[in-house]
A protein has these predicted regions:
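A membrane-interface helix-boundary motif in multi-pass transporters
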Residues: 163-181, 362-380
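C-terminal membrane-cytosol helix-exit motif in multi-pass small-molecule transporters
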Residues: 161, 165, 181-201, 383-391
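Intracellular juxtamembrane helix-capping segments at the cytosolic ends
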Residues: 121-134, 320-333
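Short amphipathic helix-loop junctions that connect adjacent transmembrane helices
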Residues: 38-53, 236-252
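Helix-to-loop junctions at the C-terminal end of transmembrane segments
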Residues: 68-81, 165, 267-279, 364-365
Length: 423
């Protein structure tokens, strides 16, 4: 239990209760999202009878709500983060139930949009909630543990799918309904999350901005754009290469994905601690070098076992880029800017995630499968150069610097008062 982050004041405090509720929500969300995603492709093929082009269309449609997330959060900016998360999980659950009602491509599109809107919102708000649980210097640890819990939920979901479909290969509707129920349970849990800042309770929720696009946060935006482009390239073509080029079957693909999930689950807390201990500049630079190794190896090493190893390496480090970017943002932004800035980051990430894979797919028709991975190496190289410029202390926004100076002044006055009383 060494990796478990003890909340400020212990488990009986509001921070401890919030930690447990967020962990329950994260586990439920990880299970529901990954279980439903695991069976969706087969469901579209076996039940809705999608054609090849329709898979491409539905993939693009599914990413659009992520691009529009900033609009949604701007409209609901008065809603607390915990209630917004609970609402998003309800929307996600409704989308999953809609899958059961669909009979073809056009009838499933509205439900895909709803489900995507729900899970993209949760993916943003859970970072903001996690960072509220503790002080700034421990943000990476909390987010790392939550990433591990997400992977644990995914692992349980993949195991459930494997054993259920081994005996009942057409049980799609029941799986989607079960995932919807689990998502709703996660929504119930997070609804009770307390209002916190730095792990300490607030009487009322902290106000936040409707929308934020500030020059002070430019490095966070750039990292989000590069991360979205690289990430979508790999996950669009990574498994496809294992299947089409190396001829790997369903059982082999399942094993690779399970190994990747187990490794990520085991090492996520450690990676979060490294972000806190060594800082974002060092950690994100190392992660981007690892991306270059994984993507370059995937393109250059024409060997199935090495390709699987590079896939596992990439999948293991993939969650840590957004965690490092989020902790960097927390160090330079005022509290009311963090949630809308995270939403802006997701929007920018999806702007590239929609465009880049399509362009790479067109290029792929004329050249070898290696090209998307070389492009991904280029994005990782640029990101590595950007991370070398990160210096949270010097890059704080003017409002954040003023807030820190005021807090330091108040602390100094309090210390002086204590000394005077002692004298």
């Amino acid at each position: 239990m060494r990796d478990l982050v003890r909340p400020l004041g212990g488990w009986s405090t509001p921070a401890g209760r919030g930690y447990i509720l967020l962990a329950v929500m994260t586990l439920a969300f990880g299970f529901a999202l990954n279980t439903s995603t695991t069976v969706t492709t087969n469901y579209f093929t076996d039940v809705l009878h999608f054609t090849g082009p329709q898979f491409g269309y539905i993939t693009a449609i599914r990413e659009v709500p992520g691009f529009l997330l900033i609009v949604v959060t701007a409209l609901l900016y008065r809603m607390s983060q915990q209630r917004l998360t609970a609402l998003a999980l309800v929307v996600f659950a409704v989308g999953l139930v809609g899958f059961v009602l669909a009979t073809g491509f056009w009838s499933v599109v509205p439900w895909v949009i709803l489900g995507s809107l729900g899970f993209h919102t949760v993916m943003q708000t859970q970072y903001a909630l996690g960072m509220n649980l503790t002080e700034e210097s421990r943000s990476g640890r909390v987010l790392g543990v939550m990433a591990g819990i997400t992977q644990a939920g995914a692992l349980v979901g993949m195991g459930a799918v494997f054993f259920v479909f081994l005996k009942w290969p057409q049980l799609y509707h029941e799986v989607f309904l079960a995932c919807a129920v689990i998502a709703l349970l996660g929504g119930v849990a997070i609804f009770g999350f307390p209002h916190l800042h730095e792990g300490r309770p607030l009487r009322v929720q902290m106000p936040r901005q409707r929308m934020v696009l500030a020059r002070d946060y430019r490095y966070y935006y750039v990292l989000s754009i590069l991360d979205g482009a690289r990430q979508q390239l790999f996950f669009s073509f990574g498994l496809w290469v294992l299947v089409s080029h190396f001829g790997m079957g369903v059982s082999g693909i399942s094993l690779v994905v399970i190994v990747s999930t187990v490794v990520a689950m085991a090492f996520s807390p450690w990676a979060g601690r490294m972000i806190d201990r060594r800082g974002e500049r060092w950690t994100l630079s190392a992660i981007n070098v690892a991306y270059i190794v994984a993507l370059g190896g995937y393109a250059l090493m024409d060997n199935l076992w090495l390709a699987c190893a590079f896939y596992v390496l990439y999948s293991f480090i993939a969650p840590f880029s957004p965690i490092g970017a989020a902790t960097y943002l927390r160090k330079i932004a005022v509290p009311q800017d963090i949630a809308p800035s995270l939403a802006m980051g997701v929007t920018l990430m999806h702007a590239t995630a929609i465009v880049v894979p399509v362009v790479a797919g067109v290029i792929l028709n004329f050249v070898g499968y290696q090209v998307p991975f070389f492009i991904g190496c280029g994005f990782a190289l640029v990101a590595a150069l950007v991370t070398l410029r990160l210096d949270p202390r010097r890059q704080r926004s003017a409002a954040r610097a003023a807030l820190d100076d005021a807090a330091a002044g108040a602390t100094a006055d309090e210390a002086a008062g204590c000394q005077a009383v002692g004298a």
